[in-house]
Amino acid sequence: MSAARRTGPPAVLLVAFVLGALVLGTGGGRARGSTVARQPQAPAVAGASTTTAAPEAGPEITLALAGDTYFQGVLADRLAADPSTVLEGVRPVLEAADLAVVNLETAVGEGGRPEPKEFAFRAPPTALTALRSAGIDVASMANNHALDHGREALAETLAAERATGFPLVGIGVDEDEAYAPFTTDVRGRRVAVVAATQVLDGSLAAAWTATDGQGGVASARRVERLAAAVREADAGSDTVVVFLHWGVEEQSCPSGDQRELARVMVEAGADVVVGSHAHRVLGGGRLGDAYVHYGLGNFAFHPRDAEAARTGVLELRIGDDGVVGSRWRPGRIEGRLPRLLEGEDAAAELAHWEGLRACTGLRP
């Protein structure tokens, strides 16, 4: 297995990337994984007591995770007007996290032709600028829209990643790159993000799946290949996040396939397993020592109905013992833009979300 890893500096420094000095990713100018710097131990002192103090706990870090994001309709208009303000309404919450991740549900580029499917999405490279400006640090592109405009757009997507320095995960020039994690040091903790999709349109699945000789997206249907990627990420990181495109559209309970895949991911070493695709918010909670959220819902996306307009940001606190705290920040989508709720509205939505856990088999 290739040792290639998409690598970034601490999330708070992502805006300081300079193309040519440091470009995220693997291959074609992408950076290789780096060794985590450890604090040296003090040397033993002759005649001193052999009693050693318990090691100090490392600093906690925070993750912010959100769902399906694209740039159609009013979002395209806002992107054309000013990429830096497209998602300004949720920027404070995303920027406050040490690492923020979303699912980017679109091809990125100007070329290519729409694939033979009902919906084919595309956004210009400034979409990546908009994500960064919103406080987002990395985006999963392991989904059923990443190649909506074919291989020309795939090449443009990867070129946009290199040109902007904004990291994408779950997509690549071959399977090693598609399954490679994004890794970054966050205040002394090494965090890896792996992404894959269970969902690919039947007639396009083979053409879109990354292989040794073909670019595309990481497939979660290749369960052992994905589990191997998670194990490799776990071996070189303190915290592993797996971001999946999975589930059944318009269903608010996880499928059996989702629950089984979550179990496999946790056994492989994932500390956090999240995902989207159903265009519904699903429940979240504990699975063993890990935290699983089966459906983050839409984020910046057109909601077909009131249920699809439910959204939110999952905030997780990570410490020496893994996930030590969680918070669902509920919201509503208005005009394809997410708006986080406050007061009684937030309390009502939070109670609704808590109730969604009942069909997940997860613990609070």
Task: Give residue ranges: language-model regions.
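Acidic, metal/ion-coordinating pockets
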Residues: 3-364
